[in-house]
């Protein structure tokens, strides 16, 4: 009987599913640099003037469902292939589909195994090596490929690499042809064993998404260098040290050092085997910090090539349970930044990246965490230049294991505490540190994100500490900071932070993520910043995150920003990717303006006797000499001209008392002193006159009674008419109608229907994305049916006099099914003279299982859509809420109703304005004037074209259809925003509690 030979398939374990193969034939990681022909070219820092040959552009492309069906390069015929742009991800160019998950792996979880059904992109192009590169080593460099790839040159396999957000470099010299055009083929695999530790909260996107290029290295050349600017204990001098690594034979080398102003500080010549050092002191010595980003230039010449690097003197160390920069415990006012572009996904143009960092700087942000992987290398150059502290994070996250286990320890056993994965973890630490070690902006190395904690993080920590003792190390899920120099938490409340600091006094605490900026929110930022500035062990935090991650999706003539599920991707985490301070196109949202205001580096407050003001400098290093101060007065209908404010010197971290620049006794009505601080000179990130900080000080009492202009009106006394279910009150050309059955009110003036509905008691608003989370209030409000409440009239009484008519409704406002409700009195006073209508509402929440809080307490009024101009005196011009209003100044504003709407990528509650003294809504001919009555006169309002449930039902902006009406809400109170999408609900003082209420509005015609 014949026997069968043993057979197997695929025979050899594929590299992309083999934990023991991370790279094949790649060169060691090195500092990122370009080499130039001479010093002048090197000083441009322009890679186009260096020895550099870009392979970006149009490549041929073939897409397959599995690597086993991908073209075999020896027989491949690319003439029928598609074209694709490099850099770019293939999902944004018509292949496969984008997929968004926050935690879950979108593939079977059997690490390190990867399914053989693994989408694969085959790239091909021709290239020529510049003729003057003959005789040199030619390197092929990929700055970023997701998630793994093989490379062929002229049909011969060169090597393999993985680690999506880390560069890979190959020596292709021996594969090149001098007689013909060369071919380059790259096979990219969507998944690899590395995907298990690249489970970051972002879109899964694939392909060659960063630059590809050639660079020549002479046989004897600089292959790496490390510049260490050391700062002496007194922070008045330092030593610049450089260690240069040569491939090939050593030889003569020269080094030149230029000061921040470009003056030559040192010229040195010696052997490439020597170590260079230069003492810098006196006027030549300048410290680098986020506030003073002074950069020196080092030029290193060897064998006809010059490389250039910007370096900064700064010292990072642990001291007295804090981390210090240049001897001071700085506060992090930070933001997390993913690399994302709404048009191209993971491929971010340089101009877009720089624009982001400029906007961050203009928003008073001083720290960026490169969440959760290394960015494009040009990012660090810009951060050095503009002045940012950077937490540079390794390309590591395996959050998905947390959904498979009950404890973090169990989840860590998959990879983080598994010795089989140690090499993979260390590889990512080495890639990060070696490539970016020369950048002044990097003050902290981060071991990754949400990988739990185990022996592999400990191994990373030990390696980094040996390689680079000049920086500190961060890792949030090392709860006891065994392998980290600082404690780190996510989304803790201020009280939770205080509790931690009471029992952990050996190291400082930062929030590597806080204030989850999802949609309309976060609220309560002020409480965090107050804590950062008052508790020495609390050294700041980084808002999650910089921008929404919507991808522009086109469906015919329709364009919108898509999120998880919009591409048919399963599983997905829907809109959780929309959680930034900017919209998907990087337009600032109100939350960014709020953050910029609250973290501003200068603040002004009145002394207790209100006769002087205290100016506080929150900078860590600089005084206020770079700013011009001015002041002006804001009153109802009046703003004075700005005048210069003379300040004494206010050193960093200190305050000074300054006399008020005016006589308060001369003020006869409510007034606000506005103090502004503007740049004296242009900077790299803002022009002269840019407002860095401002404050408003309330100088005098409550708002004065607003004068309503007289309106000619035929007033023949008040007339009352009643039928079975209606009560009508006529006042000349004005008629108010009361529905005795349902409590509805109408108001008609000269044939114009001013009120189509209301004012009626109303307790609901549209949900925010924070409300909708599992920790938000939506569940409670849904269970208690707050949005389904309607008015039941219990009793109506009225009385008349010559000057007014008082209509008194006793009502119950309650949902169906449930027993709880609001017992209220609505008292309408109609007068013969202005104000024509006064509405008083008082009530209490009664019954079982009532909600603890409600979205709002106020009046809902429906007006014709012609009433589309709004004027108010209060906070503006943008939207603001009770726990997010510091960025909006008290003043007088005017806007069309459509301009009050905030265009969030995901429809939700928006457009509120707080602290109003008065409000006017007009159709051009007729104006309704509204104001509160009582001791706490300010109120809030929204005016728009949608009812709350319209916003609740829509999941994208294009699903909204504006109503032919103006929906006006006048609120006595409303619920804060909080950040419960991930984090705390609104703090107690910002909650709209179900407690007794009593408020009055006056409505007049102007």
Question: What are the roles of these predicted feature ranges?
Answer:
Residues 199-222, 558-614, 618-638, 648, ...:
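Catalytic cores of secreted or luminal carbohydrate-active enzymes
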Residues 133-136, 176-181, 281-295, 666-672:
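Short glycine/proline/serine/threonine-rich loop/turn segments at secondary-structure transition edges
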Residues 153, 236-270, 278, 298, ...:
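Beta-strand-rich binding/interaction modules
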Residues 123-125, 166-170, 274-278, 656-660, ...:
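Short strand-edge motifs at loop-to-beta-strand transitions and within beta-strands
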Residues 9-23, 45, 60-64, 81, ...:
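Accessory beta-strand-rich segments of carbohydrate-active enzymes
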Residues 9-45, 86, 93-96, 101-106, ...:
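Extended substrate-binding grooves/exosites of carbohydrate-active enzymes
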Residues 91-93, 190, 289, 661-669, ...:
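Beta-strand/loop-rich accessory regions of lumenal/periplasmic or secreted enzymes
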Residues 92-97, 104-113, 162-164, 173-238, ...:
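An acidic-aromatic loop/edge-strand motif
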